[in-house]
From Swiss-Prot:
It comes from Nitrobacter hamburgensis (strain DSM 10229 / NCIMB 13809 / X14). InterPro entries: Trm112-like. It comes from the Bacteria. PANTHER family: PROTEIN PREY, MITOCHONDRIAL, ZGC:162634. SUPFAM superfamilies: Trm112p-like. Disulfide bonds: none annotated. GO terms for cellular component: cytosol. Pfam families: Trm112p. Belongs to the UPF0434 family. This is UPF0434 protein Nham_0083.
Amino acid sequence: MTTPSDRPEDTVDRKLLEILVCPVTKGPLEFDGARQELISRSAKLAYPIREGIPIMLPEEARKIE
């Protein structure tokens, strides 16, 4: 039996995170588990993760400081 924290949508696979890059800068991304976002510091964008799927569209990203 799985607990809510064991669900795959609560995290991002490390291998996937190694492969994914920011579509704007082609730079690395950081996983923010609390907000369920992938952060591009160079583009100052936060890409949402919905139901365990990273949404890598710049128009869907949140601008960050």
